[in-house]
Amino acid sequence: MCIRDRDKEVEEFFYKIKFPFTIGYGMTECGPLISYAPWNEFVLGSSGKILDIMEARIYKESPEAETGEIQVRGENVMVGYYKNPEATNEVFTEDGWLRTGDLGTMDANGNIFIRGRLKTMILSSSGQNIFPEELETKLNNLPFILESLVIEYNKKLVALVYADYEALDSLGLNNPDNLKTIMDENLKNLNNSVAAYEKISKIQLYPTEFEKTPKRSIKRYLYNLSLIHISEPTRPEPI
């Protein structure tokens, strides 16, 4: 499988019932595969091993860093973007490695473990790396949450949530009191499953689906100031 949003619980379930599966990792600039492992060699939580025709390294800003950017090179890596030297220079290091923009680790056996995107990582007040995508995956598995977006707001983590209003309506639960009870319980369950520095201070309901790119990724940059528009725990009119 090559998927955008991984679900640890689903992977663990497949693994437990001995369902044969594996997960690869790649990008268009690499034609497109970077890492892969046969299902019977797949390490749970990883994205396989780097291809034989490639090299990979984890570039860390400091030796103490928990993760680093996954950088690759090899014969299947593009030479550059067509007629766009500026973008090409941005994506390659001076010594010729392609910056994937993904943060992760690599174990002694060459298995790659992806944690999140470099540009979306949040640095906690105590210096730990917070990967919003991991928290969003957990949130999206909770009752009546269709999609979510974790942002930093006033130095705290806040989850913007687009609820399953259709399901809530069908059960007669789409009112402020019920929504607050449901989301308070979701917040409690989420925070019980994450580290102290990853705890969410608030779930804030969002009135519409989040805007997405053609690849169905949320346009995160649009939502840094969304909280100033929404205050009530119910479904408001679209902004």
Could you describe each region identified by the protein language model?
Residues 74, 79-80, 103-196:
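AMP-binding/adenylate-forming catalytic core of the ANL superfamily
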Residues 26-30, 100, 124-125, 213-215, ...:
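Ser/Thr-glycine-rich phosphate-binding loops at phosphate-binding pockets of nucleotides
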Residues 122, 147-155, 187-227, 231:
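Conserved C-terminal "lid"/linker of ANL adenylate-forming enzymes
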Residues 4-42, 145-147:
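Gly/Ser/Thr-rich phosphate-binding loop
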Residues 65-66, 113, 130, 213, ...:
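Generic structural signal for well-ordered beta-strand positions
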Residues 1-3, 228-239:
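Single conserved hydrophobic/aromatic residue that forms the stacking wall/gate
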Residues 50-54, 63-65, 69-124:
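Conserved ATP-binding/catalytic segment of the ANL
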